[in-house]
Amino acid sequence: MKRTFQPSRLVRKRRHGFRLRMSTKNGQKILARRRAKGRKRLSA
């Protein structure tokens, strides 16, 4: 059976990256929440 996690840096950046988050209203809400919480890393 194939494992579910097949790492790819490009796919990771494109799907969960900062620029994707900034590009949508809800993505910006996610970043705002993570900033408020004090996360060291805001996105992938």
UniProtKB/Swiss-Prot annotation:
Keywords: Ribonucleoprotein, Ribosomal protein. One of its GO terms (molecular function) is structural constituent of ribosome. The keyword rRNA processing does not apply. GO terms for biological process: translation. GO terms for cellular component: ribonucleoprotein complex; ribosome. Signal peptide: none annotated. Residues 25-44 are annotated as: Disordered. Residues 31-44 have a biased composition (Basic residues). Belongs to the bacterial ribosomal protein bL34 family. This is Large ribosomal subunit protein bL34. It comes from Phenylobacterium zucineum (strain HLK1). The lineage of its organism: Bacteria, Pseudomonadati, Pseudomonadota, Alphaproteobacteria, Caulobacterales. The gene is rpmH.
